[in-house]
Amino acid sequence: MTNKGTVTVLGINGHIGQHAAEAFAAAGWTVRGMARANKQAIAGVEFVKGDAESVADMKAAIGDSEVVVNALNLPYDKWFNGAMEAQTARVIEAMGKTGKTMVYPGNIYNFAASLREVTPDAPQQPERPRGEIRVRCEKMLKDAAVRGDMQAIILRAGDFYAPNLSGDWFDQGILATKGKIAAPSALDIGHSWAYLPDLGRAFEKLAWHRKELGRFENFHFAGHFVTSGELVAAIQKAAPAPQKVAALPWGLLRLIGLFNPVMREVHKMHYLWQNPMRLMDTRLDAILGPDFNTPYDEAMAATVKPFFAGK
């Protein structure tokens, strides 16, 4: 296989970092992954020990890589008081004025809940402080790209799912109780989801096509837009026996949030489940090509079957 180049994944232990690294390695890149500890070795990936608090560590991890996947993230309740912006600034500094390409995972927080078709040219009008933070961080990347310091490519996606994730919507909510499916919204409300193996391949595809793109790009990954009813049906299809169905107890999450800061922040984003916000991008669809995404039932079966193993 021809070597496509070298990529560094900052935050290799995170869900996005792992799947992006796997996709780049499978596509023929030399892959480095940086984190404080090598929690899960990935075939074809060189681990580099480093701390995201250290510009020097990140600069060393980036080295001669042409592409950097910024998969760093902070705990959900630690985004505030300038922490996320400071992390973004450190990565920009570590990139230097080299013209290298950064690929950055965006999300839907930037947009008003009333928006139904969320396209790249849609106005960014965040509903919550968390969305305002994301808007500021993306502007920092755009400013660095406009200055000519680097190329910045944002790939925006919905909620993640994949086999064997911990701390995700299935592990913590939808399938947290044995024998029960907790529907996160009314059954007729759609939601944007991203199957992480597909999203990882999309990161690689954009990196490979980077020379055909502008200095700053904002892409929206359509993934799978499905209603909670369709989600429940896909889980039932993959389950070894029929599961009871109930509504996710958002009121309970709110009460837990009085004592648990992470749950408090999760509940603040409840509005995303009450509004069908569909990510759309015909330009990205053309780059990725037809039939890019894993079929929904297949992706869901792979994701949920481990929950039923041995049952």
What is each of the regions a protein language model found here?
Residues 130, 158-165, 185-197, 207, ...:
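Glycine-rich "substrate-gating" loop/helix at the edge of Rossmann-like oxidoreductase active sites
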Residues 5-26:
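N-terminal Rossmann NAD(P)H-binding glycine-rich loop of SDR-like oxidoreductase domains
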Residues 88-135, 153:
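Conserved Rossmann-fold NAD(P)-dependent oxidoreductase catalytic core, especially the SDR/UDP-sugar
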Residues 174-194, 198, 205, 212-214:
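A conserved pocket-lining segment of Rossmann-fold NAD(P)-dependent short-chain dehydrogenase/reductase
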Residues 1-6, 202-266, 286, 293-311:
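Mid/C-terminal beta-alpha module of Rossmann-like enzyme folds, strongest
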Residues 107, 139-163:
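Conserved beta-loop-beta element that borders a ligand/cofactor-binding pocket
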Residues 10, 34, 71, 104-107, ...:
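SDR active-site strand-loop-helix element
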Residues 38-98:
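NAD(P)H-binding glycine-rich loop region in Rossmannoid oxidoreductase-like domains
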